From Swiss-Prot:
Enzyme Commission numbers on file: 6.3.2.8
Protein name: UDP-N-acetylmuramate--L-alanine ligase
Record-linked HAMAP family: MurC (MF_00046)
Alphabetical list of InterPro entries matching this protein: Mur-like_cat_sf, Mur_ligase_C, Mur_ligase_C_dom_sf, Mur_ligase_cen, Mur_ligase_N, MurCDEF_pg_biosynth, UDP-N-AcMur_Ala_ligase_MurC
Location in or out of the cell: Cytoplasm
Entry's family note: Belongs to the MurCDEF family.
One BP annotation, GO: cell wall organization
Pathway per the UniProt entry: Cell wall biogenesis; peptidoglycan biosynthesis
Top-level enzyme category: ligase
Known function: Cell wall formation.
Short name of one Pfam family: Mur_ligase_M
Domain of life: Bacteria
Amino acid sequence: MTKEQKLQLAEIRTMIPEMRRVECIHFVGIGGAGMSGIAEVLLNEGYHISGSDMAENTVTVRLAQKGAEIFFGHQASNVAKASVVVVSTAIDPSNPEIVAAKENRIPVIRRAEMLAELMRYRHGIAVAGTHGKTTTTALTTQIYSEAGLDPTFVNGGLVKNAGTNARLGSSRFLIAEADESDASFLHLQPMVSIVTNIEADHMDTYGGDFETLKQTFIDFLHNLPFYGQAVMCVDDPVVRELLPQVSRQVITYGFSDDADVRLINYRQVGQQSFFTVQRKDRTDLDIVLNIPGKHNALNATAAIAVATEEDVEDEAILTALLNFEGAGRRFDQLGEFETGNGSAMLVDDYGHHPTEVDVTIKAARAGWAEKRLVMIFQPHRYSRTRDLYDDFANVLDNVDVLIMLDVYSAGETPIAGADGRALCRTIRGRGKIDPVFVPTIEALPPVLANIIQEGDLILTQGAGDVGKLAKQLASMELNIETMKKLG
């Protein structure tokens, strides 16, 4: 970091003089993607950071190397030095660290409240929506970085070009993923808000009422100052429906004829996307985006719309998108590997909603039409499987071979008829494909060994621990005997 950048950073920190009274910030569940990002930014700002989690992972290792104090397991003594305790909604209120903090009158705040403090005196760009948040945040970060704007960013997944999910920049810009799953994005007060799309998800947060979810997005947009900007995907029917209710400047984007920033002439060749972006009063941009799928072209167009308003030079936009390496676990190509039955391509994807699974399948088909598509799908949460059961069945039978794992519960209690086995039976009953149910990841390798063929595209899909399986498969010699031994 240059001397000038250090001075800019010092200036940013002095904008929040009251925060200087905070000596130690403790994170309960520090190993999670959203929590670790904020922790890393604060650590780099010079705060003492401590945190706890149940097990070590790559994130906790990195934070420890940077100077954070990491505890494994949750106990009251972990918060002894804390000036404030940061929690996510995934943490049970009976957690001993939360109980101890409250008993000792240590403030306990939600993750989004701390993110809001980071954003308070910066030019915040918040990326919201049911799908595409992580990739759009990464794309916007890539463009701003290429333009030399050195943004701070906090993302829900790895920004591959940066090698991390969060970084402290020296400029006034902060680009952050805004989480609607617990409505905590209402704490944020950005200057620019992107809304990629709105669908029914996390409905328990909203009392099962879709109208409440829609109103929450409107409230989020009205956290913008009157001079702020809402960048909204007009292709999404719910977003379009809400446009008249948004009392801030709106910039629309999408394939639609009436979009302010319009995407045309899309085509995909292998992993790359080619398209043109038309902008009012600006020259058209012929884009080469280094990730596949129409959905990612839309995500890139959102980032272009924001960058255009900031007068980022076109060359920086073009270069950033051409060199974009993607976001972690978003159509993550882990390479070709050799098996006893031949060579196969391995792709890992985080998508766990029917819409996300659908666009991933379409991207795979568009780029690798000649390959047999073998999906290993792990449903995420019983409630989501129940609420979107028919949608999952409609989407999942569009692959050639489906291997179904049981539900990754994420702490939920099982719901009868909303599990992997039931979903498998429903899909089989339609007669299009004959899915294979495998109850656990540990039982999968020998099953997979008997299924893989030369030229297959193997897609591990889901938000649970199926991603760990993908890394395991990518890191070993996948001969048949090895896989059978794994079983």
